[in-house]
Curated annotation (Swiss-Prot):
Name of the protein described by the UniProt record: Endoplasmic reticulum chaperone BiP
Entry-linked PROSITE patterns: ER_TARGET (PS00014), HSP70_1 (PS00297), HSP70_2 (PS00329), HSP70_3 (PS01036)
Range of residues in the leader sequence: 1-20
UniProt xrefs under InterPro entries: ATPase_NBD, BIP_NBD, Heat_shock_70_CS, HSP70_C_sf, HSP70_peptide-bd_sf, Hsp_70_fam
The gene coding this protein: GRP78
Gene Ontology CC entries for this record: endoplasmic reticulum lumen
EC identifiers of the protein: 3.6.4.10
Transmembrane segments: none
Motif (Prevents secretion from ER): 646-649
Length: 649
């Protein structure tokens, strides 16, 4: 771990603690919200402990559903979900699966096919369309999430007896920047200032580790909810919760298991009755409601009955479902949850026996087969049973809210999260120059000096990428900006300081400064930026492993070419400088060196696709001409360079 990381960690500790002193007066009571795909939960740190707050129906978790009745009345939570089967086209859910994504996203297109409500394309963003009274209205996923957040705000205010304006909201660890920004926007729409976005497995680790602050432990959090899946590996040591590695899938959860059951029963009905019930939205939603109940029953029973009155065209439906059949239908999905577990183990460098505790979070971890797979992976190690999987994330968010608002008994907790992907910029030859490696603790800030690639270059373009491959063409483009007004100077002379800064919410800001003139420019990678889908993240990581040898060869070739080019131009500049080397050589010697450098430059222009060995040979040829001449001046030493070499933009 480098010096800059230690400094970042230390500063975070100070900022967290000093923040506490003034937070209470500024924010009032800060609540913690777990904004889930299928259910949401709210908590508050009060009287020295976390209170998970029940809604007006007495339930501690609230469905993430919004509906509009025939007369335009808006229903949120239990009331909305309860009328799903009678009003399917005007009942909205799954906003979390759409938020921050493009309309043409593969997962979005797959989800649209099973929704009873319409999803329309508005500027390549998915909008959820319903009938509100006499008019049709399209809602952005942020708006629907905002309605759910406003319900959680209302639940907290009813319990506290005071207005709530600030919150900590959780998101899946693998949410990208666009999804995080969109979640913050949803909070603002709901009248909440989202002080912090924290990762769900990290929040769960806080819930687990709050009473274990004095011991050092390695914790693996396995968070499988209704629509998303995360795995994070953390260390807990003296109140410091540090994420070591994270992985996951923002499109895997209990709803996918339900869909497998729905597909199975639809086929079964068609086989027996010769009719397709998918043409009737009400029938499908009735079936969805019953398979969800059956799935829950099968967590404790080995068999159950799916019984639905008047399912389709006046006919009742009754079919058995066993736990074995449920597991068979979802076998591939269940087993796919182990891939991110393997990934975080690999990234952390820890062995299975190094894991002190496994924390299961999210309602889907109640499925016995999931528990069995995790247990077997860790050599029959029993997962921790100390926390409620439905409430753990909101619990941790409430603790973090307490830290921010200055509540006593939380001041010694420090939360250190990580960025899930490497961030960097493109340098000469299309090389991905990494500034912030994957799994770096955030918040973090990293700067590096670069220079120009051509003489008298007035502008440099900073192109920002994320990904694990050595070449930018294989990574994901985030954005770009120009730094202009660079005074005329030989290539390699200007000093351009590029700074990457990731804040506590995982949001990236990139700036560039010409150290000579002080001129600056920057970009914030925000919700308008086309950030990665989780599938692209997983593909990049897999590709990085698959093509690692090929990548090394390509990178070596570009580096050797850059070395040759830098040497040729550096030598030319030095022999022109009469104050230095140029003043100590004869005209014939200067011409010999310049001709050799020009020949190397011309060869590179004529051979852009040359192999690594060819570049090395050309460099050796150039050195064989230059070395004997300058060795007389420097007693056999290599020619001096003007300064420490800098990568070129």
């Amino acid at each position: 771990m480098g010096l800059s990381t230690y400094v970042g960690t230390f500063l975070l500790c100070i900022l967290t603690l000093s923040h506490c002193k003034s937070g209470k007066e500024e924010y009032g009571t800060v609540i913690g919200i777990d904004l889930g795909t299928t259910y949401s939960c709210v908590g508050v740190f009060k009287n020295g402990r976390v209170e998970i707050i029940a809604n007006d129906q007495g339930n501690r978790i609230t469905p993430s559903y919004v509906a509009f009745s025939g007369d335009g009345e808006r229903l949120i939570g239990d009331a909305a979900k309860n009328q799903l089967t009678s009003n399917p086209k005007n009942t909205l859910f799954d906003a979390k699966r759409l938020i921050g994504r493009d309309y043409d996203d593969k997962d979005v297109q797959g989800d649209i096919k099973r929704y009873p409500f319409k999803v329309i394309n508005k500027n390549n963003k998915p909008y959820m369309k319903v009938q509100v009274g006499s008019e049709e209205k399209g809602f952005a996923p942020e708006e629907v999430s905002a309605m759910v957040l406003s319900k959680m705000k209302e639940i907290a205010e009813a319990y506290l007896g005071t207005e709530v304006t600030h919150a900590v909201v959780t998101v899946p660890a693998y949410f990208n920047d666009a999804q995080r920004q969109a979640t913050k926007d949803a909070g603002a729409i709901a009248g909440l200032t989202v002080l912090r976005i924290i990762n769900e497995p990290t929040a769960a680790a806080i819930a687990y580790g709050l009473d274990k602050k004095d011991t050092e432990k390695n914790i693996l959090v396995f968070d499988l909810g209704g629509g998303t899946f995360d795995v994070s590996l953390l260390t807990i040591d003296n109140g410091v919760f540090e994420v070591v590695a994270t992985s996951g899938d923002t499109h895997l959860g209990g709803e996918d298991f339900d869909q497998r059951l729905i597909d199975y029963f639809v086929k079964l009905y068609k086989k027996k009755e010769g009719k397709d019930i998918t043409k009737d939205d009400r029938a499908v939603q009735k079936l969805r409601r019953e398979v969800e109940k059956a799935k829950r029953t099968l967590s404790t029973e080995h068999s159950t009955m799916i019984e639905i009155d008047n399912l389709f065209e006046g006919k009742d439906f009754s079919e058995p479902l066993t736990r074995a059949r449920f597991e068979e239908l979802n076998n591939d999905l269940f087993r796919s949850t182990l891939k991110p577990v393997m990934k975080v183990m690999e990234d952390s460098g820890l062995k299975k026996e190094d894991i002190d505790d496994i924390v299961l979070v999210g309602g889907s971890t109640r499925i016995p087969k999931i528990q069995q797979l995790v247990k077997e992976f860790f050599n029959v190690k029993e997962p921790s049973r100390g926390i409620n999987p439905d409430e753990a994330v909101a619990y941790g968010a409430a603790v973090q809210a307490g830290v921010i608002s200055g509540v006593e008994d939380t001041g010694d907790i420090v939360l250190l999260d990580v960025c899930p992907l490497t961030m960097g910029i493109e340098t000469v030859g299309g090389v991905m120059t990494k500034l912030i490696p994957r799994n770096t603790v955030i918040p973090t800030k990293k700067s590096q000096i670069f220079s120009t690639a051509a003489d008298n270059q007035p502008t440099v373009t900073i192109q920002v990428f994320e990904g694990e491959r050595p070449m930018t063409k294989d990574n994901h483009f985030l954005g770009k900006f120009d730094l202009t007004g660079i005074p005329p100077a030989p290539r390699g002379l200007p000093q351009i300081e590029v700074t990457f800064e990731i804040d506590v919410n995982g949001i990236l800001r990139v700036s560039a400064e010409d150290k000579g003139t002080g001129k600056k420019s920057n970009i914030v990678i925000n919700k308008e930026t086309n950030r990665l889908t989780p599938e692209e993240i997983e593909r990049m990581i897999q590709d990085a492993e698959k093509f690692s040898d090929q990548d090394k060869q390509v990178k070596e070739r570009v580096e050797v070419r850059n070395d040759l080019e830098s040497l040729a131009y550096s030598i030319k500049n030095q022999v022109k400088d009469k104050e230095k080397m140029g003043g100590k050589l004869s005209d014939d010697e200067i011409k010999t060196i310049e001709d050799a450098a020009d020949e190397a430059i011309k060869w590179m222009e004529n051979n852009p696709q040359a192999e690594t060995s060819d570049y090395k040979k050309q460099k050796a040829n150039l050195e064989s001409v230059v070395q004997p001449i300058v060795s007389k001046l420097y007693e056999g030493a290599a020619p001096p360079t003007e300064s420490t070499p800098k990568e070129e933009l």
